[in-house]
Amino acid sequence: MDFPYPVGHAFPLFLAPMAGVSESPFRLIARRFGADVVVSEFISAVGVARGLEHLFHDMRFEEAERPIGIQLYGADATVMAQAAEMVTEACNPDFIDINFGCPVKKVVKNNGGSGCLKDLDLVQRIIRAVQNATHLPVTVKIRSGWDDAQRDPVAIAQRCREAGARALTLHARTRTQMFSGKANWDEIARVVDALDIPVIGNGDIATAADVVAMRAHTGCAGAMIARGSFGNPWIFAQARDLLAGRPVRPDPRPEERFATALEHARLALRLQGDTRKTALEFRKHLGWYTKGVPGASQLRERLFQIESMQQAEAIFTAYLARDAVEQAA
């Protein structure tokens, strides 16, 4: 079955929508390393409807990021429809994705995100309202249920399909699980069997091999990578190697990791325009990019104190110089 937007490969790889991570700079990096489709951070429909300028700034993207979806969350069908119409006019992404999966307390306390899963009639009203407000394809991201007592991903997925969802991503955990325990890939397989639209698998993809394993286990139409991409955009290229039957490219050496981190930082600074703010917000990314390199803990200790990316670059340069001396000794 076909996706309602261009995907580039028979089995597309998606960068998941993640607050504070799936911003335009990292989306560009992920696309360069092989992500077929990217999705924005989740955006408040209420904020969009109110015309909050910073949200429209957050939704900006470059043509190189396409295909891209803008993800909206909210619990009021009328407001969601208004926001979808405004996003369509202002941004014209390739699709609108509805967030029925976010487990964060500040979102679900107003029945947004996975809070909507407690009321499947509301889920359907939201999907129909958004679909009627835009000419763009409408897709959804769900969890397996609110809790174990209400865990029924097939029923949730079928209701979404009935309401008009054109593709569906399942994170195979409940809201109460948050990110604990294991994602139940068997549930993804059951949803795949139950629907006639593309089903994207999500949950517990930490390596390229996990992508191949998920496809084999579930029969999903694509894989969405979330935390496995943190500081690791190479996961997309390595997964594509495996899917294509090619030898898998090796993990990057420290110099490649550092160069990519700095490229990511330059993109972030271009978007942010504030050297110190960019550096402070980028510390988490530096921690992820340096995971697994020799002496990582001492390196991160220094990187977590930077107040400019020039300081980070100097730290990386000194690290590589010491490494070269040690290898020559």
Question: Which functions belong to the PLM regions below?
Answer:
Residues L117:
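Aromatic- and acidic-residue-enriched carbohydrate-binding clefts of CAZyme catalytic domains
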Residues M1-H9, M18-D94:
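Glycine-rich, positively charged N-terminal anion/phosphate-binding segment
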Residues D2-F14, V48-P67, C102-G112, I127, ...:
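N-terminal small/glycine-rich loop or linker at the start of catalytic domains
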Residues M1-A10, F14, A19, S24-P25, ...:
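Alpha/beta catalytic cores of nucleotide-metabolism and tRNA/nucleoside-modifying enzymes
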Residues A81-G112, L120-I197, H217:
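Alpha/beta enzyme core
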Residues M18-G20, I43-A45, Y73-A75, G101-P103, ...:
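Active-site beta-loop-alpha junctions enriched in small/polar residues
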Residues L13-P17, V38-S40, I68-L72, I96, ...:
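Hydrophobic faces of well-ordered beta-strands that scaffold small-molecule active sites
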